[in-house]
Swiss-Prot record:
PANTHER family: L-SERYL-TRNA(SEC) SELENIUM TRANSFERASE (PTHR32328:SF0). It comes from Escherichia coli O127:H6 (strain E2348/69 / EPEC). Its main location: cytoplasm. Homodecamer; pentamer of dimers. Binds only one seryl-tRNA(Sec) per dimer. Its cofactor is pyridoxal 5'-phosphate. This is L-seryl-tRNA(Sec) selenium transferase. Pfam families: Se-cys_synth_N, SelA. Converts seryl-tRNA(Sec) to selenocysteinyl-tRNA(Sec) required for selenoprotein biosynthesis. One of its GO terms (cellular component) is cytoplasm. Belongs to the SelA family. Its EC number is 2.9.1.1.
Amino acid sequence: MTTETRSLYSQLPAIDRLLRDSSFLSLRDTYGHTRVVELLRQMLDEAREMIRDSQTLPAWCENWAQEVDARLTKEAQSALRPVINLTGTVLHTNLGRALQAEAAVEAVTKAMRSPVTLEYDLDDAGRGHRDRALAQLLCRITGAEDACIVNNNAAAVLLMLAATASGKEVVVSRGELVEIGGAFRIPDVMRQAGCTLHEVGTTNRTHAKDYRQAVNENTALLMKVHTSNYSIQGFTKAIDEAELVALGKELDVPVVTDLGSGSLVDLSQYGLPKEPMPQELIAAGVSLVSFSGDKLLGGPQAGIIVGKKEMIARLQSHPLKRALRADKMTLAALEATLRLYLHPEALSEKLPTLRLLTRSAEVIQIQAQRLQAPLAAHYGAEFAVQVMPCLSQIGSGSLPVDRLPSAALTFTPHDGRGSHLESLAARWRELPVPVIGRIYDGRLWLDLRCLEDEQRFLEMLLK
């Protein structure tokens, strides 16, 4: 060992001496003596390795307390961190989909802090059913006879098929054999549910006669799947639920629909593209309709099934129902969200998903122009900061071909180097509340459709 190496080793402090320093008192109070000591041992090992490999000390050896604080602060951050979603996708699956209404947040908080009547009947002090209160709300909104709640729509489809068609055939159009994110495929779900898929028609054209010819003594269901994340256009033909229900009645085969995104209001009244609604399918005579709670409905992740009482009863009594049931927090948030639909006049104000989807391009444009000047002054040496029109998307497989006019702040490096864009995006991801945009066409785009806390946004980006 050289004299220089020996000198470097001698500069490493003893853990006991570090812990006696006043700067470590608050760290021990905050993170605990055990964790602070563990980290100091780890850092000493790192320092010894650096001396051995490169004959130098880490820069943080100048201030051990500061480095320990930085590491433990980062370690203590939640894995689920709030972010500012400026990607242009309102219902971003990777960012948690629908924001919850204040009423839903309050309901969840109350449910977490206290015992609740989850499965307890106050009238007779007996055991109640956890879906009962929500079933009544859903029946009121959709016109269904009964309802069932599980933890997401994939679970809803699995339960619906397993409870009503296991060991039998389910007839589906080839054009509706969807795959959604995470390789969730209708044929795979049917196989897991114990059903046999009977494909009919072609990718682009399916007629009533195709369903009729497919029905046999082993047919359990005629199924429609809403193609919420793609669209087949051009030379196409499909039959709607009303026509399929009429055929099902003639052949004595019930019809079920996986609606996917599941809007409970006519979006066209807000200037948005219309999406099929569960209440329309119930009115058409569909026996079971499944849809998501955290997409266009604007609530928590949940799978909702509405339909005929005798069919729902089969779902409720199936063993999978217990495995897939929703917990009290989900039910509390969903109930509070559904109650907002009882007052449609205030829905676009109180439901964040609808509020964000209905923001006008003009309002977003004005916001972008207001933010452009201070950001250009701060970033102008490296980037051209401009206001540009853009198109937002709804996301989560909802209305896949429809776009919403919006406005964005774009950052274009003066030297045209893409690495500068990546570096800027990485810096913003390290902010106390990370700002998430998207890089496209040589620019970093911040679509402002979902920006509501403008002051917090500016404060962070101007530091």
